[in-house]
Design a protein with these regions (language model features):
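C-terminal accessory/tail domains of diverse enzymes
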Residues: 1-37, 50-191
């Protein structure tokens, strides 16, 4: 690799601790090759959505939308709000429209672009939900924490949704260690 080469790295499906171990090795190799990331890069995480029912879909979208202002705080400025063409905000979509959707197709119609922080269009092709907000990184710590955050949010969405205006310290699906990690990220990225 030299400084003129750009590429997109796509992993195979990774699952559980074994998947995280493989990811850690890849991050180590990328770092040892002096791979550099810039503001045009994004980390896109696909999570299995094959077994989602409509309640889980609605709760997930409402939770992400209601948490978006807090999530924005621990993302770089280039990934906040609607500042990035490739990961649009969910804020402008009315809660009632999300709640009234009867199936995934209706939700996909409400969120027709794949260039959203939460991409529902991925479901039709891959049976996944894609999260596009995170900035590009080769830091295993950042990726692991983000994947765990998303996994816990999805698990929570199977039973409920976050209320509007919720603060990071009140996210019920995060443990104290992960809350501390994101508080430190927020402080580091404060504008």
């Amino acid at each position: 690799l030299n400084g003129n080469d750009t590429f997109e790295l796509v992993s195979p499906i990774l699952e559980g601790e074994g998947g995280l171990e493989k990811l850690e090795r890849v991050c180590w190799v990328l770092d040892s090759c002096n791979v550099k990331i810039n503001g045009s890069c994004g980390l896109h995480v696909h999570m299995n959505a094959e077994d989602f029912n409509i309640t889980t879909w609605r709760n997930l979208l409402l939770s992400y939308k209601h948490a978006e202002a807090e999530i924005d705080k621990f993302m770089p400025a280039s990934r906040r709000g609607s500042s990035n063409t490739y990961c649009g905000s969910l804020i402008q979509f009315p809660d009632e429209r999300i709640r009234s959707a009867r199936n995934i197709r209706e939700l996909q119609g409400l969120f027709p672009s794949r260039y959203m922080k939460v991409n529902l269009q991925a479901y039709s092709r891959h049976r996944t939900v894609e999260f596009r907000q995170h900035s590009g990184t080769i830091s295993f710590t950042k990726i692991e924490n983000w994947v765990c955050f998303l996994d816990r949010m999805i698990t929570f969405a199977s039973v409920g949704s976050l209320p509007a205006g919720i603060r990071l310290e009140d996210f019920p699906f995060l443990g104290e260690k992960q809350k501390l990690y994101y508080k430190l990220r927020t402080k580091k990225l404060a504008v």
